[in-house]
Each structure stands twice: as C-alpha cells, then as structure tokens.
Amino acid sequence: YRPENAFEKSVLTRLEKIPTDIYESVEEGANYIACEIAQTIREKQKAGRFCVLALPGGNSPSHVYSELIRMHKEEGLSFRNVIVFNMYEYYPLTADAINSNFNALKEMLLDHVDIDKQNIFTPDGTIAKDTIFEYCRLYEQRIESFGGIDIALLGIGRVGNIAFNEPGSRLNSTTRLILLDNASRNEASKIFGTIENTPISSITMGVSTILGAKKVYLLAWGENKAAMIKECVEGPISDTIPASYLQTHNNAHVAIDLSASMNLTRIQRPWLVTSCEWNDKLIRSAIVWLCQLTGKPILKLTNKDYNENGLSELLALFGSAYNVNIKIFNDLQHTITGWPGGKPNADDTYRPERAKPYPKRVVIFSPHPDDDVISMGGTLRRLVEQKHEVHVAYETSGNIAVGDEEVVRFMHFINGFNQL
C-alpha cells in the first residue's frame, strides 16, 4: 500500500481516478493532513493574506483538529489569519440547540485556537424558511468576497455524500437547503438521540462550492467507509455517489487508513495491477474471487479462466489450473470442522484447531451484545456441547443503541404487565 517509487505508484494506482494515500493508522493520516493545512496557513501568513478553510463536523476530521490544536499550543501555529466556513448545518434548529454541527466544530477546534470570532461563518439553522434562498445566496457571496476557499476538508457519508450533498445532487449545485435521506438521518440520530429529534433537512455547501476550493482533502477511516471509497476513487462519476465528483478536481486528495482501503483494487485484488508475491492467503483470496467472477466451483476452473482474469502467474507457479484448484480446494476443506475447539484424541495435522489441551478455555470477543449469537451461534453451541469453558467479552454495553423514549415506553409496559 506504500509504493517505493513513482513508477511503482503509477502502476499500483492506475485504476484510481483521485490521488489516494493509504496510512497505517488514523493518527498518521490525520497528522499528515494537519501538516498540509498548517503549511498553507503559514504560507498565507507570510504573504499577509487570509487562509480560507471550509470545515465539517463529524468524526472523520476530529484527529486532524486535535493535531492542529497541538500544533497551535506547542509549535506556535496561529489562526489569526484564518477564515473558517462551516460546511453545513442541520435545519431547523432552536436557538438553544446544543447538537448543532457548529457547536461540534467549536468543541473540536475553534474554541481551542486563537481564531478571531469575526472570521467564523456558519449557516444559521434557526432562520425562517422564506429567507433561506436569499441567505444561501449571500453565504456564497461571502465565500467569494474572501477570494474563495483555499482548503476544503471533507468526510464521506454512508451513501457517498460530501457535506450533505446527497445522491442526486448536481455538479453545479451551490449552498442550499436539502432534505436528508433516511441513511443520513439515521447517522445523525446518534447526535440527537432519536430519529424523531433529528432535523429533516440541512443547509449545506453545494458540490460546485466545494469543487471551487483550491485544494480538497477527503478523509475516511474504518472498514465501514471501504465500499464508498472504492466507488468514489475507482468508480465512474455519478450523481448517485456525489463524492465521485472529486474526480473532476485537479487538486483533490484522498487520505484513508488500511481498513478504509480494503476494497481498492491494489489492496483487494493486487494481481490486476501488478505482479504479486504469492502466499497461501493471497492465492486463496484470488481463487475465491475468480470463482465468484466466473460463477464456477473451484475444481471447474480452467487455464483459460486464469489467463483471462489476470492470474496467469499462478499457472506459471503451479504448472496448471488443475494443480492450483486441488491445492486450494484441500486448503479450504481443512478449514471446515464440526469441532471448533479441536477434536480430542485425533490427528490434528490437517485440522484448523489443535487437539490438545482439552477442554480449552475459550474467550469470544463480541463488538456488541447479540453479535456473538447472531454471527456464530452454532459455533458457540458446539463449543459448549463439547465441554469447553466458554466466555464472551462484550466490547460495549449497547445501552446507547436504544433511545431513551424506547426505554421509558418498555418500562411502562413492564410495570403495566406486572400489575395484571
């Protein structure tokens, strides 16, 4: 994922339509972007000019903001010449709303640096509906009055949105009021507590406004962003994935961690873009992919299938499709067992789990209550039936997954039921 030179990078990334850098961790990627922003701020300071930033709330940029705060406190990075435009705001909001995107932006960055409050601009989620059109037009004019945006920092939503430009947004769209779809509202409900309390719309910078920035950085961390990153970076430009519009920008960059990169061709199917150092895991991955692509079982794959789909290296390595097929078939067959904790008093040479010790003490880590029984209930049952000592470690209590209103309603039901 880290090419050693420009030639190797050009080979590995030839299917990627936006320059994309993959980092080992969120912190590493965020620190790089923070340094890029800091460098632009300092260059503008030396020239005696403002640096205009378009910034979002949300989780994706939070590590970038933390690094900028550190640089401000420890390295003297000043924000006195910085203009900040909030990218979007929920609508409608009450005047005392604490869940606004602007409040989140202040808590994550603005309250911790020396930026002049007069240099901070945000859409107003409390304005009257009949004034929104004119308000959005003036917001665009204000951006233009400062010479446009120098850096736009973006996250990518679950439906491929940038800011709140939902699927269907046009390339020439500007700041406007937009209805939020169910996916965006469900995501925002984590902030507002329940879907009922979540605003139904947002005032957002448009696609054209964002693409007008001199530099654009798109951040994505975690495997839940992997599918959208692939569509954005390698897919066609489409209004169904508004982030794909970044392919038209001549200075857009994508920064992602390894988890978010897992669907990119150079990570998921590297044999399509370069020669590979083949190991058992990569070979299995390639053969399973080839089966899915051709619709054939492993033992039916032919030399032609391998040659036509970028896997001729395996034919050279093993001599024929038959030899590869047999090896991978046997490898996969040996991962299937009715004894997940190991079969006692049996030859475990080709079994996925060793026979001894028996019984075993087993710890199963479950990201959330119920994930264990939903995803591997049969395995759990077998482990218990085969006399192993089984423990489940839940990595979260799951209490915030249920809204307060649901809890209260259920408590009323229980109280009423007990009185019957």
Roles of regions detected by a PLM:
Residues E43-E74:
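Glycine-rich N-terminal segment of FAD-binding domains in flavoprotein oxidoreductases
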Residues N81-E89, A220, H253-L258, H391-E395:
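Short internal beta-strands
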Residues F7, S208, K214-L314:
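ATP/nucleoside-binding phosphotransfer catalytic cores, i.e., glycine-rich phosphate-binding loops
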